[in-house]
């Protein structure tokens, strides 16, 4: 809905854009896994959060440009999935692969977080319009960076 509201002319291309978003999810997760193997899960999670924030800023700045908006949304989705594997990797490393229960709880909480985020998005969109969703996403990305900085200092 966000892209269609900004650029109604892209409606015939939405199925291709959605395929691109799906490929971005897969690619982001794949690249994130390789980066996590190279630099460690904590640093790669921070990198993913910084990339997410940068992509949101670029979406905000280049909002009037149709194709740059689509490109940066694809980049944002890649960076969002960049951290997909790192949470489970971190739990597995900390518990020395002994806690399938914690991995299961983590998966459930990720689903709960997605449901909470979708509900929050619905409230924000109803109160102030779909354009404001970019600001909410930017604020949550910044909050994620702050939480990770505090966590990295507390648990080096």
Predicted regions and their residues:
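Short amphipathic helix-loop junctions that connect adjacent transmembrane helices
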Residues: 1-12
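Small-residue hotspots at the loop-to-helix junctions and early N-terminal turns
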Residues: 11-19, 104
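Residue-level signature of mid-helix packing/kink "hotspots" within the transmembrane helices
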Residues: 22-30, 114-115
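Helix-to-loop junctions at the C-terminal end of transmembrane segments
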Residues: 28-40, 125-126
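C-terminal transmembrane helical hairpin of 12-TM major facilitator-type secondary transporters
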Residues: 42-87
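A late C-terminal transmembrane helix in Major Facilitator Superfamily
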Residues: 94-128
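A membrane-interface helix-boundary motif in multi-pass transporters
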Residues: 123-141
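Multi-pass alpha-helical transporter architecture, strongest
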Residues: 138-156
């Amino acid at each position: 809905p966000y892209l269609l509201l900004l650029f109604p002319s892209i409606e015939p291309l939405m199925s291709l854009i959605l395929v691109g978003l799906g490929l971005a999810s897969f690619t982001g997760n794949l690249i994130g896994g390789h980066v996590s193997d190279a630099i460690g899960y904590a640093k790669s999670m921070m990198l993913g959060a910084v990339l997410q924030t940068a992509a949101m800023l670029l979406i905000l700045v280049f909002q009037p440009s149709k194709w740059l908006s689509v490109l940066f949304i694809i980049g944002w989705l890649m960076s969002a999935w960049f951290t997909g594997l790192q949470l489970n990797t971190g739990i597995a490393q900390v518990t020395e692969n002994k806690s399938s229960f914690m991995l299961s709880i983590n998966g459930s909480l990720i689903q709960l977080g997605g449901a909470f985020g979708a509900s929050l998005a619905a409230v924000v969109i109803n109160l102030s319009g779909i354009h404001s969703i970019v600001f909410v996403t930017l604020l949550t990305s910044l909050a994620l960076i702050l939480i990770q900085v505090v966590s990295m200092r507390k648990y080096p």
